[in-house]
């Protein structure tokens, strides 16, 4: 529990812990990502050749902490409360204030933990945290048209279809159209969660 007891912010839900990544998470992250490469690569942009290097991971950890302190990115790892096992990650990026109060959503989950409702629980917890602690009122997301699991997740969490982003993002070296979703918090319906942080 030493990696969790003194860290803030920590978001707790029924089964999950969400927190900033630490350098100590490196080995667990490499194992999970490599085990899930085939599962994840078809949905994600191509990776840097040094993607799995510890040095680059350290830079991402510092980036996450710096941008959290600036309140412009929330980049959290997701762990099981039962055994503190790393299962995935969730990010709110491009956080904008003023008249926008919005952010862009990204997430990933290890293959062995899919279809268990984990990301649904994690996303609902993140949305409550973002609304209550950061002042975000709108979250936008984009997914490939054939990523049925991702579309079902967003729709289950009450994201609404907004259209198609033409040649929105490069996946596997090719510009791909994406389905665009968004949620505003006055339309969100979710169970209350115990949330600590900020």
List where the protein language model places each region.
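Conserved GNAT-fold acetyl-CoA-binding loop/helix
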Residues: 41-62
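A short helix-loop-beta-strand connector motif used in the catalytic cores of GNAT acetyltransferases and
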Residues: 49-50, 62-77
């Amino acid at each position: 529990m030493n990696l969790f007891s003194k860290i803030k912010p920590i978001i707790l839900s029924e089964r999950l812990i969400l927190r900033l990544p630490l350098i100590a998470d490196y080995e667990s992250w490499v194992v999970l990502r490599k085990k899930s490469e085939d599962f994840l690569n078809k949905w994600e942009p191509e990776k840097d050749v040094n993607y799995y290097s510890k040095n680059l991971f350290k830079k991402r950890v510092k980036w996450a902490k710096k941008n959290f302190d600036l309140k412009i990115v929330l980049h959290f790892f997701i762990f099981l409360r039962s055994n503190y096992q790393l299962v995935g990650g969730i990010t709110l990026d491009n956080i904008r204030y003023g008249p926008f109060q919005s952010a862009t959503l990204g997430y990933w989950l290890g293959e062995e933990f899919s279809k268990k409702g984990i990301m649904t629980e994690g996303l609902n917890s993140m949305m409550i945290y973002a609304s209550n602690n950061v002042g975000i009122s709108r979250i936008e997301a984009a997914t490939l048209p054939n990523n049925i699991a991702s579309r079902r997740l967003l729709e289950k969490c009450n994201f609404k279809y907004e259209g198609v982003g033409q040649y929105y993002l490069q996946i596997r070296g090719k510009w791909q159209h994406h389905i665009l979703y968004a949620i505003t918090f006055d339309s969100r319906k979710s169970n209350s969660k115990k949330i600590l942080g900020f």
